[in-house]
């Protein structure tokens, strides 16, 4: 659930979206939930391509691309969530951020398995990117309105974000009512 959206630069990021933690059990995450997170992570890059065209895509999504690739690789190598099958293909120590351990794990597998892993990761990310672009195209009017408001205010709270979004898409009764109450308070 979105907590805040801002255009104000933070570190290397030119704008950010903060999410509230979900109510689901973080120890038990489904393939669908992980894939949805990858789709969301590719949203900014997808929006650039849909709105401005592929030649105008910027480096702004570099961190997002690293993150979604890392998550997709874990889907394949740690969670068995690919066409390769339900196998753990790397030792747990090689799943973390240690580059040397990852390189050693990769050197211990066959070239074909390494290529299969790379192909499975690419398939997941490519499919998620197509879904992200479809979401952007389908919700272009909402995105354009959010951009207009963000250009004016620079930052939107989660309820204000949902109030604008609910004018274009069904976000569920409970979220719609909360957003409407917040919008009424903001305009009163």
PLM regions: where:
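Soluble catalytic regions of large protease machineries
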Residues: 1-188
